UniProtKB/Swiss-Prot annotation:
Cross-referenced SUPFAM superfamilies: FAD-linked reductases, C-terminal domain (SSF54373), FAD/NAD(P)-binding domain (SSF51905)
One GO BP: D-alanine catabolic process
Keywords: FAD, Flavoprotein, Oxidoreductase
Molecular function terms from GO: D-amino-acid dehydrogenase activity
EC number: 1.4.99.-
UniProt name for this protein: D-amino acid dehydrogenase 2
GO terms for cellular component: cytoplasm; plasma membrane
Origin superkingdom: Bacteria
Amino acid sequence: MQITVVGAGIVGISTAYALAQEGHQVTLVERNPGPGEGTSYANGGQLSYSYVAPLAGPGVLSHVPGWLLRRDSPLRLKPSLDPVLLRWGLRFIAACNRERADRTTRELLALSFYSRARMEALRAASPDLSFSFARRGKLVVYRDAAAFASARAQVGYQATLGCEQHALSADETIAREPALAGARGAIVGAIYTPDEDVADCHQLCVGLFNRLCALPNVALRFNAGAESLWVEGRRVRGVRTAHEPITADAVVVAAGVASAGLLGPLRIDPGLYPLKGYSISLPLGEGGAGSDGAPVVSVTDAARKIVYARIGRTLRVAGMADLVGWSDRLDPRRVQTLYDETRALFPAALRASDAGADAAPWAGMRPATPTGVPVVGPSPVDGLWLNVGHGALGFTLAMGSAGLLADLIARRAPAIAAAPYALAR
């Protein structure tokens, strides 16, 4: 089958790779000059297979008024009459209940566990694929006793779904990650997950791209973003780029937030809105792990919604969720918040990186659905497939989403239930 995949971020390029491995004739279309240059470029770097609790949780609405009044709030909302934002917001509010949050957790865990299995299979089959992968575990630290109690309850629920997680006291947390010693008075405890990973998402995109380049059944079209989907009747015929139309038997839309603009004229609404996130990448000193002030274990500050991941000789600091429209312009105030929070939690790491010199501030537009569950599967247009809406979990869920979509396109029974990720759900 001739299949065109739109988008070469981690979701799109994983999809193209999975389809090419099955022998399809694959054309990968991307507006940027290279792979992984959008939201996949400098994300948080955490492969959080067990920590998938949705933003739309039962207690989140009570925090929103306070968040909106804080300069350093983990969530920022720009007042707007944008009907897309209003519709997204109403759906988000409707999802902020225990029943829906538990269901979302189950659905995301099923996809993330499958994604981990496929990532491990990829690494086993490609030992020379270098993307700074490391399994060091993850600590989610809490500053508030009530929030920590809620997290412990979530651990109990996720244990019934196959997750291995442990609640640690503040002292146990610091024993697990000594770089947190300076925050002893600020944290009350943490949830530790031993089998979580870190890696460089952009490096993996480049590695998969290089493998695609070597395959005879793959064509690559970069600097050639899809301007529209070519549909006749209710059947897809291909995509139209600025340079040429590309015919196809099937088209997969995996273009992040840009997917909304492609699908809108067809009146297909996967419920996407960009959650803008930020990162800095701090070069670490020559002392090595344990002496450069940076954590070895991945750390998430639950209250601040900021993650810290050691990726090679870099400390990636990323986070926040801004609902501020469709521009990826850097907000220097949000970047400064990342510096300030790093200085408060890991001051030695910031000093070791020469006070943040060459930290490459970055912003990315994470394509989020209101519930946090991506849309993976067919559309109402015959031959048009969707792989969109992974939010902050794109890196975590990419391999599983690609495998699920490959199963569905091949008309075979998928490895996991497909219904939770369908457009009509």
